[in-house]
Regions:
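Cleavable N-terminal export/targeting peptides
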Residues: 1-51
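Outer-membrane beta-barrel "beta-signal"
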Residues: 232, 238, 259-271
């Protein structure tokens, strides 16, 4: 005969499984709704201008939000947009591959981002699916909130309506997926806030970045408020011919929280 404690434990386990299943259903629903929304845009506004963007960056190292990820990498981008709605696929992979026999060791990432911009308000809202399990990890299509290797993140970005002071601020929060607490039963809701200020000096485009973590977030190795990303980026296009220029960039990055610093060089190829 089952005791009340056993019955309670079984009930709790079933409840957790139900929650995990609901989380997986929610994520699948978001993906389906996004696809349907894009198809509806094409169907209802066939005459709307569709814009595609294809490009790739070759970088000396991959640093994400002030944190070193891996060495030299290729980072391709494929995106398309209809009016103010866009869908972007961005990825990164280094050159490690299967260097240790059959053991996969490459750093591999694929991020999918659905975004909508409100031009008159200067606002952009987006939802991203970030997957960086690496080469050979498999289970890409595991969307169970308890076992998935995906990180799902929502963001809100705002650009000040001041032409001479185009400061932007963005807030990112992971709301589902692998961003879990130590027990693995609750989301951490790790958040990151970033300010960017672009400007130009002669023919060089510059951008100053300051990124902070507002509260405890193991994802960023913080126990509370911390500055994790201070950077200065410079971009310049080298003229090769009258019809072709090669964009290059360098970025100096400091992470006060980790007491670390990086410098990255990159080349961009785009249509």
């Amino acid at each position: 005969m089952k005791t009340n404690k056993n019955i309670s434990a079984i009930a709790i386990m079933k409840k957790k499984q139900s929650i995990d299943k609901e989380g997986a259903r929610l994520i699948r629903a978001l993906i389906i709704i996004s696809i349907i929304g894009l198809l509806a845009m094409f169907t209802n506004k066939a005459s709307a201008q569709v814009r595609f963007n294809v490009q790739g960056d070759l970088v000396s190292s991959y640093v994400w939000r002030g944190m070193y990820q891996t060495g030299a990498s290729i980072q391709p981008t494929l995106s398309f947009s209809v009016e103010n709605l866009s869908l972007t696929a961005w990825g990164s992979t280094d050159f490690d591959g299967y260097r240790n026999g059959n053991i996969p060791s490459a750093n591999k990432e694929l991020d999918l981002t659905l975004a909508y911009t409100f031009p008159k308000l200067g606002l952009t809202v987006s939802v991203a699916d970030m997957w960086w399990a690496g080469q050979g990890a498999g289970k890409y299509f595991d969307f169970n909130n308890k076992t998935t290797a995906h990180h799902f993140e929502a963001s809100l970005a705002y650009v000040l309506p001041v032409e001479k002071f185009p400061l932007s601020i963005a807030w990112y929060t992971m709301f589902a997926g692998m961003d879990k607490n130590e027990k693995g039963d609750k989301n951490n809701y790790s958040s990151y806030v970033e300010l960017n200020y672009p400007f130009s000096v002669k023919s060089v485009d510059l951008n100053v970045t300051c990124g902070i973590v507002p509260y405890k977030a193991p994802q960023y190795y913080t126990n509370g408020f911390a500055v994790t990303n201070v950077a200065l980026k410079g971009s310049y296009a080298i003229k090769i011919t009258d019809s072709f220029s090669l964009p290059i960039f360098s970025q100096v990055i400091w992470n006060p929280r980790m007491e670390d610093a990086h410098i990255v060089f990159g080349i961009t190829l785009k249509q």
